[in-house]
C-alpha cells in the first residue's frame, strides 16, 4: 500500500467517523418533526399490511420493527436510514472486492460511497430509496455469486433479495431490465441464466414467492398501487422538454460528486469492456436512460434513478483510482 493510499484511507475514515458523529448529534438535538412522507410511513407502521396506497409494504414493516425495540420516537425513525446506509456501504465493499479482488480499492469504494453527496444527504431522510439501494446492492452481490459460482442456492437467494427490493419500491423492476441487458451483452451470463434454465426457474420462483402476498393484496384492492404509480409517471401528459433532461443529468452529477465525475470523464477512454465494466454499466446505464427519457417527456425527480448510482459509482471509483498515480481525496 502506497503512502498516498494509506493517507487517503486514514483521512477518509476520520471524515467518515466525524460525518457519522455529526449526524447522530444532529438527530439527538434537533426538534424538527417528521416530514410528510416520513409521517405517512410511520402511520402505516401502526397498521401493518402487505401493501399501501402509494408504496409497497417494506418501509412500514421496518419502521414497526425498529420502533418495537427502540420506541416510537423521532430519533428511532432518523436512525433507520443511517444504519441501512452503513450496512449498504459494507455491501458495496463486498461488491467491489468480488469484482476487482482488491481490498484497498474496496475499502476506498465503500468509504467514498458513504460520503457520496446522494448518500450523505439522504441518510437524514427516511425514504424508500434507502431500502431499495440496500437490497439492490445485495441483489447485485448475489447476481455476481450466481455467475461465478452457479449453485442453486445462490439463485434462490438472488430471487429473495430481488423480491424484497420490489417490496421496498417498484422501481426494482429496473433490476430485471438490467439483467436482460447483461444477458444480451455477456456470454457467461447467458449460459448461466438461459442455457441452464433450472437456474432461471429457481430465481423466478423465489422472486414470486416473496412477491405473492403483495400481488394478492393489490389484486384485492384493484391494483391501486400500480394505478397510483402509473398516474405519478404521467406519461399520458408527455411533452418533449429537453431542458428538463439536462436538468436531470446535472442532478445526477451532483448526486455522484461533480469532482469525481469530471475526473472520471477524463479517464473514460481508458475503460476496458471487461465483464466488470459490462456488469456495472448494465445495472446503471439502462436505468439512467429510462429516467432521462421520462424527464424529457414528463418529469423525473433526481432520486428516481438512485439505484443506478451503485454500479456506476463502483465503476467510477475504480477508474479514477486505477488511472491516477496520486490518490485524490474529494
Model regions and ranges:
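Loop-to-helix entry region of an early transmembrane alpha helix in multi-pass inner-membrane enzymes
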Residues: 57-61, 71-90, 122-125
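Hydrophobic/aromatic-rich transmembrane helices and adjacent perimembrane loops
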Residues: 48, 255, 283, 297-324
